[in-house]
């Protein structure tokens, strides 16, 4: 192949020189006759440019098939201006060079073959450079393949990548996960003897104020979490547990209200449990900074803060439920008993509650019912005002009604006290005032039922009622 390429290059160069020799005189005459026109190629190119252009045209005319076949040859560059040397001399030189190379490589061929035999065939390099080119990323190779072949190649590539990844993972060692490379860039820290810098403090001799100061400096969130734990446990015990009992007994029907109470109850319990775990870490002197419990506490606190908006809206209803439970129990929670103001029999109490929960108007939580009960007086007042206005509009053309003064017709009757209207109450009040006056005039007899045990109201040591002698 090398000989053929050299012959082809020599022949082309000889043809160009022959053409250049034949046309040199003609071109000189043309140049002397008239200058080249701008449309002529000689106006822009010389002989060397024309040679390269003709060569590129010939290559394009032959097509890419011959170019690809030429790439399969050994990586020998084709000479542009080769020397016109006989082929026999070239063959002799090549044979001598091959013999010299063979003599040089005989010593290392055995060692190289042994090294190649010890390598896994799947990890060894190929023998030809062309195997590593013309991948499936180009449009040319994909165009001649079907969709099924392309998918098969992609699947094989994926499997091969997984095999390589598993092999690399198995090759990892413990040193690969260390931070030795970071320690190399770290600044050397001067080592100080702990016995010289450590100050031993006797906490028994430290005052409470100093202890609190040290505690706030070390972990400022500890005291706040303790106070928050006390508040949340008190709220769970006094408010949420009674309401959860009402939900379990069916007094508060299932709905959004009961779901809200259960959510808040579980949220508070989880928050208190995480605070308790944090306190255990502090008691065991375990560093809590960066511990997952800190992130968990922040999450629960954010959720509790989101519930504060709903707590403000339902605070009055919750207080009403708690007072009703502490006072009259389930009887006060029965809406039909409040509307009719009658005392149903105890045997029918459960039936009434069951009917109320089954009716569609009581599908919502009991909290909404008490909200309606609070709004009832205002609705009644508005209804009365509307009825009064309607009555006034209807009686605009009627006669004017008499006033209270005309209806009573008291005239010049003197004003009397209200107590004079009822003689029994009047004499009772008169007797009460007489007893008070009698107690101030005559001392009541107090018989000695037991021995003297001192003044009942106590003796004031600072009081002096004696008169000094003059």
UniProtKB/Swiss-Prot annotation:
Keywords: Acetylation, Chromatin regulator, Citrullination, Developmental protein, Isopeptide bond, Methylation, Nucleus, Phosphoprotein, Ubl conjugation. Its main location: nucleus. GO terms for cellular component: nucleolus; nucleus; small-subunit processome. The modification N6-acetyllysine is found at residue 140. There is a cross-link at residue 140 (Glycyl lysine isopeptide (Lys-Gly) (interchain with G-Cter in SUMO2)). Residues 1-47, 62-162, 329-357, 375-457 are annotated as: Disordered. The keyword RNA-binding does not apply. Residues 413-440 have a biased composition (Basic residues). It is found in: Nucleus, Nucleolus. The modification Phosphoserine is found at residues 37, 146. Residues 375-386, 441-452 have a biased composition (Basic and acidic residues). It holds the Pfam family Sas10. Citrullinated by PADI4. Residues 68-107, 149-161 have a biased composition (Acidic residues). The modification Citrulline is found at residue 376. One of its GO terms (biological process) is chromatin organization. The modification Omega-N-methylarginine is found at residue 8. Part of the small subunit (SSU) processome, composed of more than 70 proteins and the RNA chaperone small nucleolar RNA (snoRNA) U3. Belongs to the SAS10 family. Essential for gene silencing: has a role in the structure of silenced chromatin. Plays a role in the developing brain. Part of the small subunit (SSU) processome, first precursor of the small eukaryotic ribosomal subunit. During the assembly of the SSU processome in the nucleolus, many ribosome biogenesis factors, an RNA chaperone and ribosomal proteins associate with the nascent pre-rRNA and work in concert to generate RNA folding, modifications, rearrangements and cleavage as well as targeted degradation of pre-ribosomal RNA by the RNA exosome. This is Something about silencing protein 10.
